[in-house]
Amino acid sequence: MALLQIAEPGQSAEPHKHRLAVGIDLGTTNSLVATVRNGIAVCLADEAGRSMLPSIVRYHADGRIEVGQTAAAAHTTDPKNTIMSVKRFMGRGLKDVSHVESTPYDFIDAGGMVRLRTVQGVKTPVEISAEILKTLGARAEASLGGPLTGAVITVPAYFDDAQRQATKDAAKLAGLNVLRLLNEPTAAAVAYGLDNASEGVYAIYDLGGGTFDLSILKLSRGIFEVLATNGDAALGGDDFDHRLFCWILDKAAIEPPTSDDSRRLLMKAREAKELLTASEEAPIRARLSSDEEVNLVVTREEFATMTQHLIAKTMAPMRKVLRDAGLGPEDVKGVVMVGGATRMPHVQRAVAEFFGQEPLTNLDPDKVVALGAAIQANVLAGNRKDEDEWLLLDVIPLSLGLETMGGLTEKVVPRNSTLPIARAQEFTTFKDGQTAMAFHVVQGEREMVKDCRSLARFELRGIPPMVAGAARIRVAFQVDADGLLSVSAREMSSGVEASVLVKPSYGLTDDEIASMLKEGVEHVGDDMHARALREQQVEAERVIEATTHALEQDGALLNADERASIEVAIAELKQLAAGDDPRIVKKGIEALARATDEFAARRMDNSIRSALAGHKVDEIQV
């Protein structure tokens, strides 16, 4: 396939040397590292034979750092220095972190990404995640017997630019060469598609510890295409734990619990949730700091009932993602379950009822993402055979665009565009003699900038002064395979250029992620009306300004009545532009145009006479 001759990031030109590359699933609850051995993707285990590494980091006062199982053991005895589920904090501010009251950490909200105070000083989520990646990298090098060429690291499909960049920064800090960031649902499709040689449309239902992603993928003749994605970056297995934890507090009449009791009971809730996967009921026993004992039993049905609202939160994205892909549940050939939380029977039951078929579970849902990442890493490292060629096409989940005059959004890269992608549009100046232009890059589906998310701002200076509308400024958007955006602006006649690499200070809030697509659909009618009105208002402003300028320059061409007529039309248009009906504003613009027709003709004649003055007929070039 000719397209595959283009080198991916990190891919070597040496075709016959096997390079050591791994796939890493950097998870909220657990992380894994996998590689391809003898053509088969396998997860790499530690010296104790354990594949899964708990995503937990503990900082000691003496400078030691523990990662994984040993760190998890200290969660109840040293909670402030034992950091769990750090993935939920990546690229986020304190106000974006859910269930803060249930966490024992000493957060510092210093603007930008949240920080945590430990006995080894203030740590960022990037630094904490880097420790997990270091441990996985060391495990891989010990298992494979040499240094790694690079790694493919998976991220939730709904991670925004800040969260993706934070992941790449953590890998760099850990000494890993990132071949590519890969969306977790896409990684699962890679594993299932290659292992089972299946073709068709698949839904990837990924409910991990801290995030929920749903993707619709089309697998056909070696091409993996993501048709649409949706999800919730703040919904996962941790939320099921928290709901059961609240149930325990209510049943045991514990109010309010101490920090130690909260941690102990949250751990018991997690253990009970896991037991209910295979059992009809689970005991919950714990001794509180007051010496009071908690002795409860929760049934599978009770747990299903108390968490039904969480299951329901996954249903709306499922309907939305199918609508985006132009499909119905009956068009889906199979449903791939990803993430440990999908082991819950009532989750599998809800998915089966929605799609009318039993979901696929023949690969370990905890390992499938790492396996797919390993297969992709093997390809990018240049280890694939010719017959193994396939193309992977990810998509961008939210539209990218620019603010135009009047606070309108001009979408440059529409959502669900295949990555990597480059798109460009030309813009022009609004005023005569304009020598600079400010650009505001936004993300979202709404028509007005105020309803979208601001990503970055930059300026292009040095534009040659021209009349309004004469300058040509080409703005190019480039989104790479990792979903990271760069924007450049170039004035075509002079070549002056400015650019920006979009690295937002922190990620989308939970509410923004959950509502941006929903609001785009719900407000489409209002948005289109608002856009039409604002477009006419901007045009009215332009026409009024141009006419006023013309009166200042060439008002002598008019008699008093003619000038008064034009001034009345200007005043009427100003009044109409303050209204809320775009059709009426448009009529006002047309009325002013009619009132100035004769004036425009005289100005043109006057300009021609001025240009010809002092020249002979034979001197004029046609």
From Swiss-Prot:
Record GO biological process: iron-sulfur cluster assembly
Gene Ontology MF term list: ATP binding; ATP hydrolysis activity; ATP-dependent protein folding chaperone; unfolded protein binding
Disulphide connectivity of cysteines: none
Keyword Chaperone: yes
Keywords (A to Z) from UniProt: ATP-binding, Chaperone, Nucleotide-binding
Keyword Cytoplasm part of the UniProt annotation: no
PANTHER family according to UniProt: HEAT SHOCK PROTEIN 70KDA (PTHR19375)
Function recorded in the entry: Chaperone involved in the maturation of iron-sulfur cluster-containing proteins. Has a low intrinsic ATPase activity which is markedly stimulated by HscB.
HAMAP family noted in UniProt: HscA
Assigned protein family: Belongs to the heat shock protein 70 family.
Protein name: Chaperone protein HscA homolog
